[in-house]
């Protein structure tokens, strides 16, 4: 089975960047969360910045409710999760996910603007688009990739 995400950790920015492909499955999501909780940066409280701009807008709302259940139940205090989308439909679907993903110590917000998400996470302006150098749709959909920057 192929998975549909790639992870890049930038410890200097205290941030985990995740780029999602078009059609993740619930199994992809489960594997992502298993990988995420194993990262030292996650356990240390790094913020998470998810690029969901390629996400297919035809996934049912029930997918996002179920996917949120796979996430860790005990995030580090003060962690933030930014969800970046590219359409109004995706914005609404990720709001559903955000509602179910909220935990004490974890702030979740949905953005349709890269700069607003970057500012909310406290990332410097000079980083540009942190997902630009990550794998495009085809490589992301072929395998999971975790790398350190």
Feature locations, PLM:
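Amphipathic, Lys/Arg-enriched alpha-helical "gate/interface" segment within cytosolic domains
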Residues: 1-149
């Amino acid at each position: 089975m192929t998975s549909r995400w790639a992870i890049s950790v930038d410890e200097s920015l205290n941030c985990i960047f995740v780029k999602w492909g078009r059609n993740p499955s619930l199994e992809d999501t489960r594997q992502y969360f298993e990988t995420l909780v194993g990262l030292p940066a996650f356990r240390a409280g790094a913020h998470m910045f998810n690029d969901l701009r390629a996400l297919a807008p035809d996934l049912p709302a029930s997918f996002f409710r179920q996917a949120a259940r796979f996430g860790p139940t005990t995030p580090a205090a003060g962690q933030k999760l930014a969800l970046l989308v590219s359409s109004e439909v995706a914005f609404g679907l990720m709001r559903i996910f955000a509602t179910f993903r909220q935990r004490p110590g974890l702030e979740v917000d949905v953005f349709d603007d890269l700069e607003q998400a970057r500012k909310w996470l406290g990332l410097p302006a000079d980083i540009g688009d942190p997902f630009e150098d990550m794998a495009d749709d085809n490589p992301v959909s072929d395998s999971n990739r975790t790398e350190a920057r």
